[in-house]
Structure formats: C-alpha cells, structure tokens
Amino acid sequence: MLYIKNGRLYTQSFSYIIPDGLCLVPDSITTAPDTLTFETLDGKFLIMLSPYETEKTPDEELNGFLKMGCHKMMSDIFEVNRGGMIGKGVFYRDNSWSYEHYEERTRYPENEEGQNAFELYIEHEVQTEADRNKIQDIMNHPKFKVLIGSIRYEPDVCQKITEEQ
C-alpha cells in the first residue's frame, strides 16, 4: 500500500517526503515488494528505498559484498542513525568507475510482513572524468537531502491511517 497524507508518502512501515523533480521508476527490478526507486530527470542519480528481511548485521551485509572484489571502497564503513534506525553506511564505486554508490543498511524491529532491515541505496552514473568523486555531494543536494532526511520508521502506520479514516 502507498498512501499520501500531508505531503508524506507512507508505505508498510515507513514514510518519506518526496521532493519535486524526482521520477518514480515503476518497473524497477528489486528484491522487496515495498521498494521505491526514484531517479533524477537527467538519469545521473538513482535512489532506492527498500525494507527487507535479513538475519545478518549491517556490517556483515556491507562487508560481504565489498569483499567480492567487484567494488572499490571510497570511504570506510561508518555508523548511521536514520529515522530511528541504527546501522552502517559506505561510499564505493565499481571497478570500471562507471558508477559510484552510497549504501546504507539499518535495522528495526520486525514488522507484520517479517521485514526487519532497511536499505538506502544511491547510484551516480559517471559519464566523464569530471563526474568522478561526486557521490558524496549527493548527500548535500537539496532534493536528496529532503528525501534522505525525511526517512522515518513508523511501526503500524497502516493500522493508524486506517483508524483515522
């Protein structure tokens, strides 16, 4: 379910403010049904918001795929606190440097769908050498700053909305 109230978009256990100028990607290939994917009009940035289920810690997940050797870290893994959730984040790029990424994995109490984890994923397409090392700038871009800063874990939000009706 997606529900909009007072400028916030609500999903199963989360809410967000979606700023003007971002495009919803309806046919996104994802692993979780509640995933929302947006991109900028120029297609240079993609952002994915995805609740999911896991038994691993954020450290285990991030270190697991980074150790595969397909990516180069652009930062150390660091602690994050996002919308009432604690986790880990990292900036990295692919080996060919055609994309730079920011990934954040956080945990929350299991919801009624069995989900207990949240992924914030941002991808930056590097088209020229001048585009390199720009992924960290995205965190200060006004549109993404609004969206990222608005992420809130809201348990039982669907039930609360239904009761208000």
Question: Model segments located where?
Answer:
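Sec/Tat-exported extracytoplasmic proteins
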Residues: 26, 69-70, 152-155
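Short, surface-exposed beta-strand/loop "edge" segments at domain boundaries and coil↔beta transitions
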Residues: 42-49, 54-58, 97-101, 126-134
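Surface-exposed amphipathic alpha-helical segments
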Residues: 22, 118-165
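Signature of long, low-cysteine stretches enriched in small and polar/charged residues
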Residues: 63-118, 162-164
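Secretory pathway targeting signatures of secreted, lumenal, and periplasmic proteins
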Residues: 6-68
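Residues that act as N-cap/strand-start positions at coil-to-secondary-structure junctions
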Residues: 3, 10, 30-32, 72-74, ...
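Short, hydrophobic/aromatic-rich segments at coil-to-beta transitions
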Residues: 2-7, 32-35, 81-91
